[in-house]
């Protein structure tokens, strides 16, 4: 380990509450501890940078089983130069058991991966399978060593690359700050899938929702408690903002669209985040204001349609509390995907809720009048504006069942908080089946 790299004691001290943790296993390349992080009981597995053997992997598997049995989160700190090759097939078997256990307890207790050094091969798969993957800026994460890859890509294997690929949810300056971020995330999540959501002291945000100067992050900040937001996947799908936070002290997940168009990365990001929230019954508040899906054959080829279908399926399948805030453009498939399956839909004065964009609808409905005009462009704008005012407003959306409440922008936070309180005891059942077959 380089002299300027933080060691085990510094990293665990940043993760656990002061004086709260006790070691469980101390020998070998992997050690473990149990304590409290941000007030939450949690297990930690720590790789010390040495090659891991079968016994080290089985030790990790045992901690995961203990976490599931006791209903507590588990955080794994990844930093290993590889595997002890003399372990042979027993090493392969131990790695297989660990990978299977990670999948088995997924959705039972939160799993957080913190990559502080090198995380390669099967370990990279295991880290990416966690609910949240956090990396130090100087850490490495890769399946195949970048210098062995046939197609050389700039910054491959780096934390920056992992963030752009949608693998790393958070990237911090160093391992100590990454550990602190992990403690923050663990504190936002419930202990397990049967525990209630976390509750916090709170202060109201400084500013209300502003539709004129709308941007995704500001919209989320206007709804969440002051200083409560922890953004996930900031480097991926930048036209959607996803963050864990709280509203009136209750933990929530917030999804907010930017006003631009949504590509396949944006929809994949939202689907991943909503699925995390649903696994642990964290309410989801979605702020909708976007021009729609990106018009691009290239994006379709990259999975645009498939990822949009995936996101629609994740939202529809989620049984957690879902509140949609229609804060601007919510037209056609955007409304269908983000708002149709919500338990409560709040339309903000000035929003546009419609099956088609007003300009498109006007050219169809008023075709003869528009073409009879001396100025087709101006006539189209006038008819579109009239159609928007008469057919697409918040009040009309409520009257026609496309929304449940119409509010002013200044009252959005209060309306969202009221909806969350009203729906807090929501119970729902699913049809008996093995699992759905949404696109992945």
Where are these regions (language model features)?
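Ligand-binding clefts of soluble mixed alpha/beta catalytic domains
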Residues: 1-440
């Amino acid at each position: 380990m380089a002299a300027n790299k933080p060691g085990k004691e510094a990293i665990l001290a940043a993760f656990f509450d002061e004086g709260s943790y006790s070691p469980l296993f101390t020998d070998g390349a992997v050690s473990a501890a149990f304590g409290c992080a941000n007030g939450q009981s949690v297990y930690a597995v720590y790789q010390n940078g040495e090659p891991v053997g079968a016994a080290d992997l089985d030790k990790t598997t045992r901690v995961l089983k203990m976490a599931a049995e006791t209903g507590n989160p588990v955080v794994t700190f990844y930093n290993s130069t590889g595997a002890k090759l003399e372990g042979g097939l027993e090493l392969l078997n131990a790695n297989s058991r660990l990978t299977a256990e990670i999948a088995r307890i997924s959705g039972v207790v939160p799993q957080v991966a913190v990559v502080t050094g090198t995380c390669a091969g099967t370990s990279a798969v295991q880290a990416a399978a966690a609910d949240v993957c956090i990396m130090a800026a100087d850490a490495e994460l890769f399946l195949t060593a970048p210098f062995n890859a046939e197609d050389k890509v700039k910054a491959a294997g780096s934390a920056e690359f992992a963030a752009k690929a949608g693998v790393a949810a958070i990237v911090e300056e160093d391992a100590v700050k990454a550990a602190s971020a992990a403690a923050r995330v663990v504190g936002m999540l419930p202990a397990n899938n049967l525990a209630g959501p976390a509750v916090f002291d709170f202060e109201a945000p400084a500013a209300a929702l502003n539709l004129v100067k709308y941007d995704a992050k500001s919209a989320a900040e206007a709804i969440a408690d002051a200083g409560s937001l922890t953004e996930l996947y900031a480097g991926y799908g930048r036209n959607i903002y996803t963050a864990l936070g709280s509203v009136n002290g209750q933990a929530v997940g917030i999804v907010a669209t930017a006003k631009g168009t949504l590509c396949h990365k944006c929809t994949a990001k939202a689907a991943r985040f909503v699925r995390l929230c649903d696994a642990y019954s964290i309410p989801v508040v979605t702020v909708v204001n976007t021009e729609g899906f990106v018009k691009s054959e290239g994006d379709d080829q990259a999975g645009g349609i498939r990822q949009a279908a995936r996101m629609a399926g994740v939202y529809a399948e989620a049984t957690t509390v879902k509140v949609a805030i229609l804060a601007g453009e919510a037209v056609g498939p955007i409304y269908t995907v983000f708002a149709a399956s919500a338990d409560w839909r709040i339309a903000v004065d000035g929003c546009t809720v419609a099956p088609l964009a007003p300009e498109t609808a006007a050219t169809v409905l008023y075709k003869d009048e528009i073409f009879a005009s001396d100025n087709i462009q101006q006539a189209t704008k006038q008819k579109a504006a009239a159609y928007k005012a008469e057919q697409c407003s918040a009040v009309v959306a409520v009257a026609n069942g496309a929304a449940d409440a119409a509010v002013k922008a200044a009252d959005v936070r209060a309306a969202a908080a009221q909806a969350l309180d009203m729906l807090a005891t929501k119970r729902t059942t699913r049809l008996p089946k093995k699992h759905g077959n949404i696109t992945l």
